[in-house]
C-alpha cells in the first residue's frame, strides 16, 4: 500500500475507469477507534457516538486513472451456479463436493447458489467443471464489479451539465417528480442517515429514502464507505431550490439505497458477503420486488454474468426501467463491459455513454455497439466554461481524505467524471417520465432515444448512441405538459 492517502483515494473515486472498487487503503490511523472497529466491523461504526455532518463548501476536482490490469476480473473463493429445479439440495451438495467445493444455502433474491471453493482454487476451471455436470443450467466465476466513476442553489452555476441539457426549462414542466416514483441506486451505499459514526449528506436532507438494503453486510444499513453512491444519488435527487449547494434532476422522487459493491473498507471490516456481479443480480431483483420504477447501475464488470442478465429481464418484467453505465475504457480499446452489453437486447434498459462540456463523446467513454444514449459525464482535464474548475459533474459526497482515515461524516462538493455520472442523468430523466405517466420501461427507453439531441455521426452511432438526452424535448415532444 504505497500510495499516499490523498492522491490515491481521490484519483480512484473520480475516475472509476476499471478500478474494481480498490481504494488501496493504508492501515487505519484513527487513534483509539481503530481497535473497536476492527473487532466489531461495521456495527461498531453504526453504534458509535454520532457526530454531526461537517459540510464545508469545498470544491474539489478529481483526475482519471486507468484500468488496474493486475487485478483478477473475478472474486476468489466461490463460483455462481444455477441448477435445474429437478436437482435436489443433496445432489447439489454432492456435485459441489466433486470439485472440492461446498454448496451454500439458498439466499433471498437469488435464483442461483454459491459454491464455495478453496481460496487458491481457479474459479474459471471450477466453473467449467461444474458446467459439464447434468442438471447445471450455468456455472460461472463471479465477476468483479467496479463503479464507473470516472435553481437558487449557490453552486448551481457550476452545474454546466444541467444547463447543457436544459433542466431549468424542464423543471418548468415537471418540478422534480413525486415521491411515488422510486429510483433504486445500486452502488457503494448512500450517506442517507444519521447514525453512529455516519451522517446523512446535508444535501440529501429532505430526500425520502425507502426500503434500504445492504447485500454486502446482509442488513438494512447501506451506509456509504466510499462516496461513489452518494455522488450518484445527488445527481438524481439531491435537494433543489433550497438555497444550498447544488441541484438534483428529479428532486422529489424517492430513493431506494442498495449497497452491492464490495469496497476495501468492507474488506477491512470483514464484511460477510465479499461477492461480485452476483450481488448486483440479487440487488436488482430486490429493487424490482420492492417497487423500484427506475434502477441505476453506475457500475460494471469485465466478465459476463448470466445471473445479472436474468435479473435485468426480471426487473423489466416487473415494470422497472434500467440505466447502465457503458464503461470508462474508451482510451484503451473500449472492451466490453457488463451488464451494459445486455442493454442492446433488452427493451427497457439502456447503456449510457458520457459526453463532455462540448457534448462530444468524452475520451474515456466506451464506444461500442451496445451504446444507446449519452448524457453529461464530464472531463476534469478541461475547463471549457472557464469557471476555474475542471469540467466534471459536481455533487456533494463524502470527503475522500476523511474516508481514508475512517471518518464518514465529512462532506465536500466534488467534480467527478465518468459514465457513472452520465447514467445518473438518464435515471433522473426516466423518473420524470414515469411521473408524467410513461410507465412502461420500453416506452421510457423509446421516448428518451426518440427525442435525444443527435450528435456526432448522423443517426445512431457507437459513440453516443441515439444522442444526448434532451429532457425538455422528451417531455414536450410527447405532449406531456403540466
Regions found by a protein language model. Name each.
Residues 79-82, 104-106, 113-114, 138-140, ...:
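Structural recognition of the beta-strand scaffold that forms the well-ordered cores
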Residues 283-285, 290-297, 306, 318-320, ...:
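C-terminal subdomain of the subtilisin-like protease fold in secreted/lumenal serine endopeptidases
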Residues 1-9:
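N-terminal secretory signal peptides that target proteins for export/translocation
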Residues 136, 152-290, 294, 384-411, ...:
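Active-site core segment of subtilase-fold serine proteases
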Residues 9-21:
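Sec-dependent N-terminal signal peptides
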Residues 25-156, 171-173:
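Primarily auto-inhibitory N-terminal propeptides
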Residues 304-321, 338, 342, 348:
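Catalytic-core regions built around general acid/base machinery
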Residues 187, 320, 341-435:
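Extracellular S/T/G-rich loop segment that most often corresponds to the catalytic His/Ser-adjacent loop
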Amino acid at each position: 500500500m504505497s500510495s499516499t492517502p490523498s492522491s490515491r483515494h481521490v484519483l480512484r473515486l473520480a475516475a472509476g475507469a476499471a478500478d474494481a472498487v480498490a481504494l488501496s487503503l493504508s492501515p487505519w490511523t484513527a487513534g483509539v477507534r481503530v481497535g473497536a472497529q476492527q473487532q466489531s466491523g461495521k456495527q461498531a461504526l453504526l453504534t458509535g457516538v454520532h457526530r454531526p455532518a461537517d459540510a464545508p463548501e469545498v470544491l474539489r476536482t478529481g483526475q482519471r486513472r486507468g484500468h488496474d490490469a493486475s487485478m483478477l476480473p473475478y472474486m476468489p473463493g466461490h463460483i455462481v451456479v444455477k441448477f435445474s429445479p429437478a436437482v435436489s439440495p443433496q445432489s447439489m451438495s454432492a456435485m459441489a463436493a466433486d470439485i472440492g467445493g461446498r454448496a451454500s444455502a439458498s439466499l433471498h433474491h437469488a435464483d442461483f447458489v454459491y459454491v464455495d471453493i478453496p481460496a487458491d482454487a481457479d474459479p474459471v476451471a471450477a466453473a467449467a467443471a461444474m458446467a459439464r455436470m447434468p442438471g447445471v443450467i450455468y456455472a460461472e466465476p463471479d465477476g468483479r464489479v467496479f463503479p464507473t466513476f470516472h435553481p437558487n442553489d449557490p453552486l448551481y452555476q457550476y452545474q454546466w451539465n444541467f444547463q447543457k441539457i436544459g433542466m431549468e426549462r424542464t423543471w418548468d414542466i415537471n418540478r422534480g417528480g413525486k415521491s411515488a416514483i422510486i429510483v433504486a441506486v445500486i452502488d457503494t451505499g448512500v450517506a442517507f442517515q444519521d447514525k453512529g459514526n455516519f451522517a446523512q449528506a446535508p444535501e440529501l436532507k429532505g430526500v425520502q429514502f425507502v426500503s434500504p438494503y445492504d447485500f454486502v453486510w446482509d442488513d438494512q444499513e447501506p451506509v456509504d464507505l466510499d462516496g461513489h453512491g452518494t455522488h450518484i444519488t445527488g445527481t438524481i435527487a439531491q435537494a433543489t431550490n433550497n438555497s444550498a449547494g447544488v441541484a438534483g434532476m428529479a428532486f422529489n422522487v424517492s430513493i431506494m439505497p442498495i449497497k452491492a459493491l464490495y469496497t476495501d473498507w468492507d474488506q477491512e471490516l470483514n464484511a460477510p458477503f465479499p461477492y461480485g456481479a452476483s450481488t448486483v443480480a440479487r440487488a436488482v431483483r430486490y429493487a424490482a420486488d420492492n417497487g423500484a420504477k427506475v434502477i441505476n447501475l453506475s457500475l460494471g464488470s469485465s466478465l459476463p454474468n448470466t445471473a445479472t442478465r436474468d435479473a435485468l429481464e426480471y426487473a423489466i418484467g416487473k415494470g422497472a426501467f434500467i440505466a447502465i453505465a457503458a464503461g470508462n475504457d474508451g482510451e484503451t480499446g473500449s472492451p466490453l463491459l457488463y451488464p451494459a452489453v445486455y442493454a442492446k437486447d433488452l427493451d427497457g434498459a439502456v447503456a449510457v455513454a458520457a459526453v463532455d462540456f462540448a457534448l462530444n463523446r468524452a475520451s474515456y467513454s466506451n464506444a461500442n455497439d451496445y451504446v444507446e444514449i449519452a448524457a453529461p459525464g464530464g472531463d476534469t482535464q478541461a475547463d471549457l466554461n472557464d469557471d476555474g474548475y475542471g469540467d466534471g459533474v459536481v455533487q456533494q459526497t463524502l470527503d475522500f481524505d476523511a474516508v481514508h482515515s475512517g471518518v464518514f461524516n465529512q462532506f465536500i462538493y466534488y467534480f467527478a467524471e465518468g459514465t457513472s455520472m452520465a447514467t445518473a442523468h438518464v435515471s433522473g430523466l426516466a423518473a420524470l417520465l414515469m411521473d408524467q405517466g410513461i410507465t412502461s420501461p420500453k416506452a421510457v427507453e423509446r421516448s428518451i432515444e426518440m427525442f435525444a439531441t443527435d450528435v456526432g455521426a448522423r443517426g445512431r452511432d457507437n459513440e453516443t448512441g441515439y444522442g444526448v438526452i434532451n429532457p425538455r424535448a422528451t417531455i414536450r415532444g410527447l405532449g406531456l405538459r403540466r
